[in-house]
Amino acid sequence: MTDEVKAVSPDGGVRPWPAIGWVRRMGPAILVLRLLVAAGTVATVHSRVGSGPGVASQGGGAQGSAAGIAVTYQQAKAAGTTANYDWGPGCDISTGRLKMPMVGAPPCVAMSTKPNGGATWSGVTGSTITVAYYIPAPGGLTTSLAGATDSTQAQLATVQAFTAMLNRIIPLDGRKVVVVPFQATGGSDDPVAGRADAISVAQDLHAFASLGGPQQTSAYEDELARLHVLCLACGLSVPYSGYQQDAPYLWGALPSPDTLLTDALQLVVSQLVGKDAIYAGESSMRHRKRTFAMVHYDQNPPIYGALNQKLTREFAATKLRLVDNESYLLDLPELPQEAATIAAHLKASNATTVIFAGDPIMPIYLTKAAAAIGYYPEWVITGTVLTDTTTLGRLYDQQEWAHAFGISSLPVPLPPSQAQARTLYEWYYGKAPAAAKTVSLILEPIELLFVGVELAGPDLTPTAFQQGLFHMPPTGGGPTDPRIGFGPNGPPPLPAYSSPADFTLIWWDPTATGVNEEGAYGTGMYRYVDGGRRYPAGKPVGGTVHFFSRAGSVTGYAEPPPGSRPPSYPPWPGSPTAGG
């Protein structure tokens, strides 16, 4: 097994930065994961390795056929054939979705009139679908961070509870999902252990899919793809080339950096190019035409080659010129010095406007370094992982970040008690989940799995799963419920293996007060322009955007606004709340 792993990944597929002592790296990392949990998302910076033999591209290498995927109520309605099918007692035909108190509940599908295909794929039988639930190794980065929120036992109990609930509600053609805990054997940055664990999941557990994986190496999901096993929520900063490489097995819950940077670039071109830097902190800059610089994360060797080439072409097409283009590696002990060097370069370049496309830790040091040398430009937020959250924004130099604005794929925040995952759990079970802090994080990949299996139809394969999600009716599009869609309905580049498919506009208000994503009261918050209005990914923002205008902006909602409120249904028959 060891020799096979080494042969598949001669370069290891691991992060390029040097090993860092546990105490030195855990401080900022604990903060980040606490935020991730509160926001209901886990973000990783993703390294890519060769696909190895047998990995599908665009689903072409996956065996099985997309024929026979489920018919949704929306499809039948468009064809005028709804009367030809049995939609089951759980379908609300007024919405075409299951009777669940959710915005964007799973779609209704026509009940199958024939037995399912039985053992259609590894991990699939006529009655069960085996799914691995990845548990990080004790003492590893993810375990240590998660310990600051909910215990592994509480999270696993909540996973099993959601699985039991969805098995009762979502029709899976006579099958039930069986979640099997899988204990990782190595750290989150160990590619050899990651590949060995993937082999165990595929060949020992015979899993159809894995929920989660190691956060600091792509070896696990790459190997699962090679072995034709799905991996959901295994990496959320994957460049689009990574999704193409591992298709149809890898699925994410945040837009690819390709999507975010393209949308940010279009905002820059439509709103900023050729105009004075009126939002800069230095008065002398406000009467100068904007000059642009970019600061972005990368690895050694670079992993965003295709994306960088695309952006270079787009820069040329729009006549946008960068006076400085800075890249850095995420080596935490070196970030303060690296930030000081970058800040000096930015000031020397006379850039009025800095486009930031990196991790959420670097701005802590970069804004401090810029302030130390009296450099106060405009900061353009591209929505890369967590830089668009109030919890992190409060850690950036406030004199600097008072001039930050841009895009975000995240929804306008709601109070934790209003989180959809929590209200759904309480609707079914009549009590709070064991993992109350991580409940949103836990539900997301489980729901994606169930919906994909539901839409795949009776002959379940990875390709049918892919085609089912590609045909899923898109949901959402309101301030608190981003538009979710995949394939042709997701964010470009297409077909999409991650979502949301829209974004909103934000700016930092250093004087606003309220609670952040963790529920902590404080000063400094992101404001959402025009009440958090969403814009389709891949399309320019029209008109003139008035950043730094409080009129019409919000920092959050006490409850979902009209149009984004979930429907109300009685308890599901047989649920604990209904006395079952």
Regions found by a protein language model. Give the residues of each.
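Solvent-exposed, acidic/polar segments of extracytosolic/periplasmic ligand-binding ectodomains
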Residues: 66-118, 122, 474-580
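Beta-alpha junction/loop-to-helix N-cap segments that form part of ligand/metal-binding clefts
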Residues: 153-160, 168-246, 253, 328-336, ...
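Extracellular/periplasmic periplasmic-binding protein-like sensory domains
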Residues: 247-255, 369-444, 551
